[in-house]
Amino acid sequence: MKKTGLLLALCLLTTGAFAQADQSSPAGTVATNVNFPAEAIATPTQSDLYCAGFVNKSLLPNATYVAGGLDTPNTTQFSDGGELIYLAGKSYTLGQRYRVVRELKDPNRRELFNGQDAMLKVMGQPYADLAIVRVVDTRSRMAVAHIELSCAPILPGDIVADFAEKSPIAFHPSMKFDRFAPSNGKAGGRIVLAKDFDSELGTGMKVYMNLGSNQGIKVGDYFRAFRSYEADLHNPVDSLSFKASTAEDTQAKPPSIEKNMLTKSSGPTIHVADLPRRAVGEIVVLDVTPTTSTGMIVFAMEDMHLGDGVELDPQ
């Protein structure tokens, strides 16, 4: 009798737990740790904020630039904290901080998804963040500055720009990640470029997206990155897997994927467009311009790709 009562109580508790889970999950879903995995969101550091790079609609003035350093000409790269460098140009303020950036070009000159070049032309010019420096001497024709924060080696000719403090991104608690969330109708765009011209992207990496403050985007907003299977179908590499056989010798009627005369089979036809889009990760906005956003990948279920879609994710 005691055993029966114990089993009944256990059944009631289990039923209650499932009911509670169903109430907290979106309509049309049963939440499990597979389709709603827990996401541990990374918090951006000071280096993440100030070393992310950016894409700017217009070119930055280049009248102020790095001319050399204490050990010129024997040293042509400057990166150590506290290292002294010389700044050419006018209007430097003693004790003021400045930002050292580099106007970039892609040495590969190859589109990684259709339309990338056209999107980038609309977005503007990519820049790398190299360092934050402070002017310590203005008695000569060139100002002397020391490096306070180094992101990457500085070279002669790199641009010196005004510095602005950035607000830290608040810690984000862990939450459930909806892998198959449909479009929410919020502002959306694409990952067009990544820092260092990377193409396979994961947690901690920086990306540049083609929407900004003109679309209401602000620092601290979160984007959900997603990919459709149609994108894989049109990718020169990923599409090879769609073309490979999925059949097994014991399968009487194997299916066709996007059936045509060459791939016709006696089984059902699978239309790639009917497969659900899948969410691949979360991106937090570190910086915005009117037409672009710089983001950091703070959670990734799989590699993100250039060309992946992004959609504003109300947290």
Where are these regions (language model features)?
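Bacterial N-terminal signal peptides
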Residues: 7-15
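Surface-exposed, polar/charged interaction patches used for macromolecular assembly or partner binding
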Residues: 2-5, 18-315
